[in-house]
C-alpha cells in the first residue's frame, strides 16, 4: 500500500512539511509506504478551461501536474497539505489540484483522501472544507478523524509543540 502526500506549502521545513512528515512517520510505523511531493516552491499556473485535458488525458502545461497524476495511478490513498492564506488553501495547491482533477480524476476515484491545514489562528476550517471538496466531488472516501486535521503555529518548532 502507498499513500501520496502533497505539500502545498512554500517552505521546505515549514509547518505543512512538518505536519506531513509526522503523518508519513505514522504511516511507516503501520507498514504503509508514502511519498511527499512538494509543489509550494514553484509557480503553478491555474486552469484556463481549454478542455484539452479531457481529450488528451493530461494537461497541456508541462509542469508537475502530469507527473503527479502518473504517481497517483500507483497509489492507494492521498493526503493534501496546505497553509491557510486568507481563510483558504494556498493558491499553489488550489491551482495544482484544479488541474490534477480536471486532467486525471479517473485515477483518484474510489481511493481515500485526507487533508491537513496549517494556520496561525483562524481560517483553518474553511481551508479544510475547500480541500475536502476535491475528494467529495470525485467519489473519494474522506478519511475522518476525531477533530479537524489541522496544526497551529508559525514555525516547525511551534507545530511540533501543538498538541
What is the role of each PLM region?
Residues 2-32:
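N-terminal beta1-alpha1 ligand-phosphate binding loop
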Residues 1, 29-30, 67, 141-163:
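Glycine-rich phosphate/pyrophosphate-binding loop and the adjoining helix
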Residues 32-42:
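A short beta-strand-loop structural module common to alpha/beta enzyme folds
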Residues 42-72:
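Cysteine-cluster motifs in flexible loop/terminal segments that predominantly coordinate metals
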Residues 33-35, 58, 141:
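Conserved beta-strand segments of alpha/beta enzyme cores
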Residues 60-144:
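Helix-loop-strand module that forms the ligand-binding subsite of alpha/beta enzymes
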Residues 13, 44-46, 123, 152:
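Generic structural signal for helix capping and beta-alpha/helix-loop junctions
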